[in-house]
Structures are given as C-alpha cells and as structure tokens.
C-alpha cells in the first residue's frame, strides 16, 4: 500500500494535480491536465514500475539529468482517476 501511494503521488505531480484542483460538474469530479510529463534524475525505479504496468511511457534517450522524461498513458490516467475518484481528460483531447 505504501508503494501504491508513492506511484499515485508521482502520477499526480506528472499531470500537475498536486498544484491545480479538479472541477465539479453534475456532481462528478473532473480534471484537465495542463501538462503530462515528468523528468527524472538517475533514480527512475518508481517510473519504471509504472511503465511495466502500462501506466506510463518514456523517451528512449536520457535527459540532461541522467534520467528520462516520462508521461502517463491513457491507461495511467484512467488508473489514477480510479484511485482518486475523478475523471482525468487527456491533455491532447
């Protein structure tokens, strides 16, 4: 359970949900991300687990910090939304 909380926090930060709040419409909660990326340093263990689960993807090349840039897939957005009880739009919609 502790690890799941860590993954939820990483995913929330990736889409900016740690800075912006969801909105309510027709008594349901929604969130429209203003971003969907997370640049890591060398420690990528949490993100690699989410990639293996199909919830995230990453660039093939390392970034300037020695890590990778990750983003949530549609499956990852749906998983996070289920965990938080909100519908998360894809920022490309």
Predicted ranges, named:
Residues 65-93:
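Short, amphipathic alpha-helical interaction segments positioned at domain boundaries
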